[in-house]
């Protein structure tokens, strides 16, 4: 939980909620703020499992997962490849389409579209709501 990304605060909230829920179920929990170099602390703790509550860069992109795998520590969350891939929305869509998984219409919003965004949306025939 915690970490270095801009989502540090929400990561703490997630981590605390998960920690509390696990404790209520009788699990022994050690909370770890994954900021800076935390590998030595992981080695000392020798966890049976890491519940990954990190958000954003480093937590969801495969970085922490690769550290845990290199230390042979099991973890919750998608693996390194799936996590990294999920951060690239356009590439994920291409893979989904290739595997016949339905995806909504989309276009990549560029900074240069700022002046004519309504025209771009109309040209692409994308209807509201837009995410």
Where are these regions (language model features)?
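Active-site nucleotide/adenylate-binding loops and adjacent lid/helix of ATP-dependent enzymes
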Residues: 1, 42-44, 85-131
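Glycine- and acidic-residue-enriched helix-capping/strand-helix junction motifs
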Residues: 1-15
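A short, GP-enriched loop/loop-strand-helix hinge that lies immediately N-terminal to
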Residues: 3-4, 47-87, 102-108
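Glycine-rich, highly charged phosphate/nucleotide-binding loops
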Residues: 27-46, 58-59
């Amino acid at each position: 939980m915690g970490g270095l990304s801009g989502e540090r605060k929400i990561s703490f909230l997630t981590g605390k909620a998960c920690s509390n829920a696990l404790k209520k179920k009788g699990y022994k929990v050690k909370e770890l703020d994954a900021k800076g170099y935390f590998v030595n602390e992981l080695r000392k703790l020798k966890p049976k499992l890491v519940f990954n509550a990190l958000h954003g860069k480093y937590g969801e992109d495969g970085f922490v997962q690769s550290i845990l795998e290199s230390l042979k520590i099991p973890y919750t969350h998608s693996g390194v490849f799936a996590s990294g891939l999920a951060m690239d929305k356009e590439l994920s869509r291409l893979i989904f389409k290739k595997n016949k998984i339905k995806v909504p219409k989309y276009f990549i919003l560029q900074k240069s579209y700022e002046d004519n965004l309504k025209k771009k949306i109309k040209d692409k025939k994308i209807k509201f709501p837009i995410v």
